[in-house]
Regions:
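A recurrent flexible, glycine/aromatic-enriched loop bordering the glycosyltransferase active site
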Residues: 141-162
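Short beta-strand/loop segment that forms part of the nucleotide-sugar
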Residues: 33-44, 64-67
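Short beta-strand-to-loop element that shapes/binds the nucleotide-sugar donor at the catalytic cleft/hinge
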Residues: 116-132
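Short, well-formed alpha-helical segments that are part of the catalytic scaffolds
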Residues: 16-30
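C-terminal catalytic/acceptor-binding lobe
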Residues: 183-278
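Acidic donor-binding/catalytic loop of UDP-sugar-dependent glycosyltransferases
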Residues: 100-111
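Glycine-rich, basic loop-to-helix element that forms the pyrophosphate-binding segment
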Residues: 67-83
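Short beta-strand-to-loop acidic/aromatic patch adjacent to the donor-nucleotide binding site
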Residues: 90-101
Length: 278
């Protein structure tokens, strides 16, 4: 597959800034030219540019320290809002979690109808040495499905290159139904599946705007997820449902999807009174 030079923005949200010691050095090793935007969602800490430079990153950099905890969705939307307000130029955008490693930013020459580029993800489950090896050389690993496994393809927003116009359009729609989304979040007994929800919303919105829109799959690994210190709870909430996790996640995503579809339907609704002037 042919590649083309493209402008890319990488967005990272962080709560425990120590995790940036994983994600930022990984980005520093990339040969691609890109802009990094970091949103610190922990009001009790301050992340400084100097801290990021000490981790080896030398490219374009913006650091946002939030005044209060927004959560993952709010932090991601805050990054997109910052990018828009500061008119940062880009063709593509990709999110990366602070405790994961982005190992590739190559953009293939794809159709205008391809709004996202899906790739593969490596998941390190048990050994820190595997994380360090993969950070040095993402091709130097043994996928044994015990210590390291491969998700092929990786379907989600983190690690997926998305066209700038598509992700900004998604941000507009999600901001319009933010209250509905938070109400669904509060009704769940587990941590909201933000990445899955945003990916589903992106697909719904892109295909609503253009029926020809579709993601494209590139069969290479570009993302390393660390699952070593995953605990049963985070921020006071269970990471996964205790029972029937798949079904509960699917039901939650279906509820988020309804909110997105209603927002899109309301965009197309004729304001009261205007139909008389038609």
């Amino acid at each position: 597959m042919f590649h083309k030079k493209a402008q890319v923005i990488v967005g990272i949200t962080t709560f425990y800034d120590e995790f940036l010691g994983l994600s930022v050095p990984g980005l520093a090793r990339l040969e691609n030219d890109f802009i990094l935007v970091i949103y610190n969602d922990n009001p009790n800490t301050i992340v400084k540019k100097r801290q990021i430079r000490q981790l080896g990153y030398r490219g374009g950099l913006y650091v946002i320290n939030g005044g209060y905890n927004k959560g993952q969705l709010g932090a991601r939307l805050a990054i997109l809002d910052f990018v828009r307000r500061h008119k940062l130029k880009s063709d593509w955008f990709v999110f990366c979690d602070d405790d994961d490693v982005l190992t590739g930013l190559n953009v293939p020459d794809v159709s205008q109808y391809n709004f996202a580029i899906i790739q593969n993800m490596l998941v390190v489950r048990t050994r820190l040495i595997d994380v360090l090896r993969l950070m040095r050389d993402s091709g130097n690993c043994v996928i044994d499905n015990e210590n390291v496994c491969q998700v092929r393809p990786h379907v989600g927003l983190a690690g997926t290159l998305v066209r700038y116009s598509a992700i900004m359009r998604m941000a507009d729609v999600l901001n319009s139904v933010l209250q509905n989304i938070y109400e669904i979040d509060e009704s769940l007994s587990f941590r909201p599946p933000v990445d899955m929800m945003m990916w589903s919303a992106l697909n719904i919105i892109a295909r609503h705007d253009n029926k020809m829109a579709t993601p494209i799959y590139m069969d290479v690994a570009n993302y390393i997820a660390t699952d070593i210190d995953t605990c049963s709870t985070k921020y006071g909430m269970k990471l996964q449902p205790t029972k029937n996790a798949t079904q509960q996640f699917q039901r939650a995503i279906a509820r988020y999807d309804v909110a997105v579809r209603i927002a899109l339907a309301n965009e197309n609704a004729t304001p009261v009174g205007q139909e008389l002037n038609a």
